[in-house]
Amino acid sequence: MNFQVTGLALDKMKLDSPHSFLDAEEVEEAEDQQLLEPEAWRTYMERRNVLREFLTTDLSPQLLKRHHARMQLLKKCSYYIEILPKHLALGDQNPLVLPNTMFQLIDPWKFQRMKKVGTAQTKIQLLLLGDLLEQLDHGRAALDALLEAPDPRPFLAGWGLVEQQLADLSVVMDNFLAMMVPGHLHVKHRLVSDIGATKIPHIRLMLSTKMPVMFDRKESVAHQDWVSLRWFVTIQPAAPEQYELRFKLLEPRTQQECTQCGIVPVAACTFDVHNLLPNRTYKFTIKRAESYTLVYEPWRDSLTLQTTPGPPEGPAPRLGEPPAGL
């Protein structure tokens, strides 16, 4: 009896060991191999490795996750028109006109039309990026399911279609990466008219991107009747920027409390808002100040803070006792 129990325990140990699972996988692979001739089996394994390599390098889950994060960031960015003069012809003695000077020469009405074009182009570009990323997600899911299919025969029979899918997904990825960077704006008409004998160089319009302005949620702190706010931009601009801070009291209880709101222009990344009510909730919103070249700003960061309670009132006098100070 003891020998039989020991033997059963040993058999159980073998079944529970990793080696038994490896044997099971080998058995399953051997069963699949019996479905194909040796040459076909080698072809199947080679093509399966090609597909696995594509899914682990060119279209890995980690890569798609990074692209999703970049896509979410682009949805929070601000988009502007950037005016750049083209190079003058060789030998021209006139200097290049600086962008600030170019604004004085551009027809304002035509420029407003180009801003609308820039807005539409930016919206379309973001929609296309989302669609391309969705194609990459669905394409990877379909190929991953094909890789895990138990029967190798449909895999071999449809390899031509698989190759086409790999090529198509590579093109989609290239288009996605190329579209991540805002490009030229197509100008149908001249924005700068000829003025007398002055030679004005042709200009080109580009869409540029600025990273979103976001509150520093660790450094922004509420006190009893004031708050200290901090915000930042992930990529620091070359020149100082102007910001617009908005605040308002949530759920005002009286008409007077409805005045607890405001818009404050700020030339730094920090600001203290005073004269607030204690133990109340306020909403704060930060964005860049309005710019003549802004074409699209779909998002702005907001933060909700609650001021701390005021000091407790003194105890009420006992019945029959005069108030304090009398």
Swiss-Prot record:
Residues 212-310 form the Fibronectin type-III domain. InterPro entries: DUF5581_C, DUF5581_N, FN3_dom, FN3_sf, FNDC11. SUPFAM superfamilies: Fibronectin type III (SSF49265). Residues 304-326 are annotated as: Disordered. PANTHER family: FIBRONECTIN TYPE III DOMAIN-CONTAINING PROTEIN 11. This is Fibronectin type III domain-containing protein 11. The gene is Fndc11.
